[in-house]
Curated annotation (Swiss-Prot):
The lineage of its organism: Eukaryota, Metazoa, Chordata, Craniata, Vertebrata. Belongs to the SH3BGR family. Residues 13-50 are annotated as: Required for interaction with HER2. It comes from Homo sapiens. Ubiquitous. PANTHER family: ADAPTER SH3BGRL (PTHR12232:SF5), SH3 DOMAIN-BINDING GLUTAMIC ACID-RICH-LIKE PROTEIN (PTHR12232). This is Adapter SH3BGRL. GO terms for molecular function: protein-RNA adaptor activity; SH3 domain binding; ubiquitin-like ligase-substrate adaptor activity. The keyword Membrane applies. Coiled coil: none annotated.
Length: 114
């Protein structure tokens, strides 16, 4: 399974850039494999992302903004959903991955199952 993060390399918005860096930095720091998919430089990536963000996750007007996160082709969420999962020590579950042994998330899951 590959985590795909759809980003815009040439975004003029500092808020979008910050959110993208936050997601990518977290994945790198936790050694979670991922692919960056640039929607600014590749029309196919932009089209695929727009078509595969579920209707109920789209903004009321306009297109979904990066970063958008997928596990293979399964939509996992946007930055706000990622941030909430991180705050709740549930990023691996959010991404559709198994938490590594010894991680805070694995400890929380073990306590819930006990």
């Amino acid at each position: 399974m590959v985590i795909r993060v759809y980003i815009a390399s040439s975004s003029g918005s500092t808020a979008i850039k910050k959110k993208q860096q936050d997601v990518l930095g977290f994945l790198e720091a936790n050694k979670i494999g991922f692919e960056e998919k640039d929607i600014a430089a590749n029309e196919e990536n932009r089209k695929w992302m727009r078509e595969n963000v579920p209707e109920n996750s789209r903004p009321a007007t306009g297109y979904p903004l990066p970063p958008q996160i997928f596990n293979e082709s399964q939509y996992r969420g946007d930055y706000d959903a990622f941030f909430e999962a991180r705050e709740n020590n549930a990023v691996y579950a959010f991404l559709g991955l198994t938490a590594p042994p010894g991680s805070k998330e694995a400890e929380v899951q073990a306590k819930q199952q006990a």
